[in-house]
A protein has these predicted regions:
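Non-catalytic connector elements of ABC transporters
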Residues: 1-75
Length: 75
């Protein structure tokens, strides 16, 4: 069964893109997404988050960017 969540978030800078590269480490992973027009954003997330969200190359993600962090959402 798949659950759908509706939520409000405080992050105002939201960018959708496609995963173009994943560099897994022991504890963290760097994820790069291409937002089009040559715009690429990279963020570091825990390896557990990478596995829990089942993020893989080619997936569509939303990057939430705040002054101190970058978060990814997989819809």
């Amino acid at each position: 069964m798949e659950a759908t969540l509706s939520m409000k978030i405080s992050g105002r800078n939201k960018f959708k893109g496609k995963v173009i590269n994943i560099v897994p480490g022991i504890v963290t992973a760097e994820v790069e997404i291409d937002m089009g027009n040559g715009n690429i954003v990279a963020g570091v997330i825990t390896k557990r988050s990478l596995e829990d969200l089942q993020i893989k190359q080619g997936d569509e993600l939303t990057a939430l960017i705040k002054a101190t962090s970058v978060m990814f959402i997989k819809e």
